[in-house]
């Protein structure tokens, strides 16, 4: 018997339906559905994970940071709210004992490979090297049968290792840096406030903060524009002055006066025709930007809808960077099926009449998947939600457009001379629709048809207009623009960028769904980290590790090498952080808990003057000690251990010195008198 492991239950159902030579037998185990099917004389079990079944967690409870000793555990242990995964793990464990062969049929990308790898190793209890791999980019019967007939001999260990490394690095960065920020605030204010950052979150927030600073520091500058309003054939037209900005008001007045005294005439008419080639097929980033422009969908919403269309079998796998459509996709068959839908029939018939279907392609490639395309499976009424209908329409029209003829646009530029000055009037129209006939609803071309102008023609002026304006600050990023910027900077992956943006919203670092504004909290976090530990938010460091993950995938680096290097780099960063922990905590606590709450840790009363004994830090060495709040009038100080959390006890010992509890990073606690001459001091200080 063979066990096929899908990524999600509805994908398991699709695979069972495609591969079974009879009607699939649906069964359940611990309430989890699975399917028994027969193919080519073999009995197959098709079961599923439910996304990630395993996550990372510390091997032991440790208080503090850094922490690097982690392991894979069931996801319901690693994360809250994932209890539903327990039954899926149990089901796979039982089913694995009934079979001799394993096939992974999760999504073919790094995340899918990690899901398959961990399910095999931990739930099924087998060596992942024994499993074969179904590789597909769409959930149609023909694609799934093709994947079955062309099984890969193993899972893609390059992808699996890169995915595992990414998970570990993200855990190291996210958990350790978040603990560091939280501990810093606790040290400064005595309050536990969870604050987080991450390997990609930090650099992403940084470029948003940089834009916010540009906007805040922007000083508007006045300028003037000059327009020539005239009439021709009963219509009004507005021509713009040759300089788009006049910086001096007096110059603007002079130009207006000179134009009014002149007799404006047409000095040139320039007509150009340009071919506009069809757009390239959709990669995920382009789809997210177009869907935001057309429908206002956030990048995450677009990805979620595209994933749903994929799982329903209507479009191909969405997490792709490819802008190419390989020839092994049966374009003609897909278009023949799309022709059954009235809204696409006219365009499909045009394409079916061509001797060859050759798509326009972009430059970007993806080794795992082609560009996004409709599968040719036709949705029935009720199959799609309203938002799914919108995105499906965009995907279909884009697919049809890439095979169509170029559009031809005509642009007209009329030059009007008024004395020594020039004005320009521009128009543009589509003279041959080509691909715009099918995709034009998603493309913004201005259609401005001008009447015929002749050189030397006198212009009937209505008004010479001078308008005062002010320069505007840079625009805030839209969600789609953030995804594009992350792509350009090499931050995150096609699959993670949308979620990183959502996380920044959830953390309270940014706000505004269309125009993203960084909150005071987001500004303060970046300002503080820039000041004390800038490497935490380094775009270069993040990009460097992204490239190393690609090298793991290509087999040119091992995951162990990259994980070890990341550990070393992060250890150094956290060492610097600890030296400035109190200062960082004070800065952050001012905005997180309020300035009034930022107070030093008081461990007792001074036996000499009655002042507060507080934890202080040496500015040169960064080492902590206890001193009197009335310094320099009172010079009482005590040394204190440099490790562990200090907890006051309200008790005293030798000569009125306070007794404190030191809580070690492993959770152990012990009491110590702060007087260095106390008989217990030396024993406890080692």
UniProtKB/Swiss-Prot annotation:
E.C. code: 5.6.2.1
Residues given in the record as Mg(2+) binding sites: 7, 107
UniProt record, GO biological process: DNA recombination; DNA repair; DNA topological change
Annotated stretches, region: Interaction with DNA: 196-201
Site (Interaction with DNA): 52, 166, 170, 319, 507
Gene Ontology molecular-function annotations: DNA binding; DNA topoisomerase type I (single strand cut, ATP-independent) activity; zinc ion binding
GO cellular component: chromosome
Alphabetically ordered keywords of this record: DNA-binding, Isomerase, Magnesium, Metal-binding, Repeat, Topoisomerase, Zinc, Zinc-finger
SMART domains: TOP1Ac, TOP1Bc, TOPRIM
Matching PROSITE patterns: TOPO_IA_1 (PS00396), TOPO_IA_2 (PS52039), TOPRIM (PS50880)
Catalytic residues (positions): 317 (o-(5'-phospho-dna)-tyrosine intermediate)
General function of this protein: Releases the supercoiling and torsional tension of DNA, which is introduced during the DNA replication and transcription, by transiently cleaving and rejoining one strand of the DNA duplex. Introduces a single-strand break via transesterification at a target site in duplex DNA. The scissile phosphodiester is attacked by the catalytic tyrosine of the enzyme, resulting in the formation of a DNA-(5'-phosphotyrosyl)-enzyme intermediate and the expulsion of a 3'-OH DNA strand. The free DNA strand then undergoes passage around the unbroken strand, thus removing DNA supercoils.
NCBIfam families (UniProt xref): PRK05776.1, topA_arch
Oligomer and partners: Monomer.
Protein known as: DNA topoisomerase 1
Species annotation: Pyrococcus horikoshii (strain ATCC 700860 / DSM 12428 / JCM 9974 / NBRC 100139 / OT-3)
